[in-house]
Amino acid sequence: MAGHSKWANTRHRKAAQDAKRGKIFTKIIRELVTAAKLGGGDPDANPRLRAAVDKALANNMTRDTLNRAIARGVGGDEDSNMETIIYEGYGPGGTAIMIECLSDNRNRTVAEVRHAFSKCGGNLGTDGSVAYLFSKKGVISFEKGDEDTIMEAALEAGAEDVVTYDDGAIDVYTAWEEMGKVRDALEEAGLKADSAEVSMIPSTKADMDAETAPKLLRLIDMLEDCDDVQEVYHNGEISDEVAATL
C-alpha cells in the first residue's frame, strides 16, 4: 500500500467539504438511526453504530445530537425504515468506484447515482463489477507520529497493519469491527488519532493525471451531493504534483 496518504489526496478538498457540513450531519444522523435500529443502541455491542458514533464525533457533532439519533433508532423512528444499497461503477481514468447509500426509495437513488456518472464520463456497473477490488477495513489515521511507537501499540491492540507514507502520515488498519477497540487502546497509550473511520480499501490504485483528476473529483462531489449517498469509495490516486494544479 505504498504511495501518498489520504492527507495528500484530500487536503485540497477540505474547504469544499467543510461547506457541506450541514448535509454531512444529516447523513450521519441517518446512519446513527439505522445502525441503532438494526443492532441496538449500545456502541460497544454494535460495531456499525460504534463506527457511526466515531464519525459523528470526528465531525464535531454534539453528544446530545447523536444520542437523540440513537434513541430515535432504538424507538423505531420512521427515518429508520432505510435500507443500505451499494452501487458500483467506473469513473474517469478507469477508476473503480463504490457508493454506499441509505435510502427508502431505490428508484430515486439509482436515478441520481446514474445521472452523476453520466454527467462526469463514468458508467454505473453491475453488482460485483468492482467490489472485488475493495476490502472493508477500519482506518485509524495519524497526520504525524512516531512510527515505532504507534506500530507497537497498534499491533498489540490487534491491528492488522500499520503503513507509513512519504509525507510522514501513518494509517493503522484493523478489521472494521475492531476499529473502536484498537482506537481506544491507542488513546490509552497516549496516542490520539486525527481520524478513525470504516472504509473500503482498494487493492490496486489508478493514477490520475491533470486531465482525469478534476473529472474524478467532480464525480465524487456530485455523488456526495446526493441526499441518499452516505460514502463514496474509489481507487483513484492523485499525486502531490497533480493536486497542486487543481
From Swiss-Prot:
Q: Cellular component terms, GO, for this chain's entry?
A: cytosol
Q: What GO terms in the biological process aspect are recorded for it?
A: regulation of DNA-templated transcription
Q: Which UniProt keywords apply?
A: Cytoplasm, DNA-binding, Transcription, Transcription regulation
Q: Where is this region: Disordered?
A: 1-20
Q: Which family does it belong to?
A: Belongs to the TACO1 family.
Q: Where in the cell is it found?
A: Cytoplasm
- Which Pfam family, an example, fits this chain? TACO1_YebC_N
Q: Molecular function terms in GO for this entry?
A: DNA binding
The record, for Gene3D superfamilies, names: 1.10.10.200, 3.30.70.980
InterPro entries reported for this sequence: Integrase-like_N, TACO1_YebC-like_2nd/3rd_dom, TACO1_YebC_N, Transcrip_reg_TACO1-like, Transcrip_reg_TACO1-like_dom3, YebC-like
Protein name, UniProt field: Probable transcriptional regulatory protein YebC
Superkingdom, taxonomy of origin: Bacteria
